[in-house]
Amino acid sequence: IGVLLLGPGTDISHRAVELIGDTGTSMVWVGERGVRQYALGRSLAHSTKFIEKQAKLVSNSRLRLAVARKMYQMRFPDEDVSAMTMQQLRGREGSRVRRVYRLQSEKYQVSWTKREYNPDDFEGGDIVNQALSAANVALYGLVHSIVVALGASPGLGFVHTGHDLSFIYDIADLYKAELTIPLAFEIAANFTEIDDI
């Protein structure tokens, strides 16, 4: 076993945690259905090489921008972003995401006005916004688990900054346009009264 996911209601003894830890198995305390990660018992990494490299790249503004450009190049493979500033990169990404929303809305015939998200009122959003929120939370949980398992820091982001999950958002953004956005619109298109987001 490489990782043990412990969900709500799990009861585990100190001795069991000790034995599991001795085997090198990671333990992750997760939310319902394994979506959110709340704590990690042990990283899969046995060295600090990733976090040291990450800290070096984040701490130098020139290197940080170079990494951000590479991340954006993954999203815009046909565009030259080599001379763009961080502000220009962020603006380009915003335009691209709005275009993806519009295209998915047309593809699935789902009404779309804008992204609306209130963390205190999930049910208050329309179906497509609820589906986007749920899909993104699942993606964040997956990315978070991988980042900490590899021994990198969730908070040392290159594009996103100032949040304890900045790097999680950076990585998740690489995949949203191909994964969570199309999935959310497909779910919204097929949603019925008896379904649960």
Walk through the language-model features, giving the residues of each:
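Active-site helix-to-loop segments that bind/position phosphate- or nucleotide-bearing substrates
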Residues: 36-197
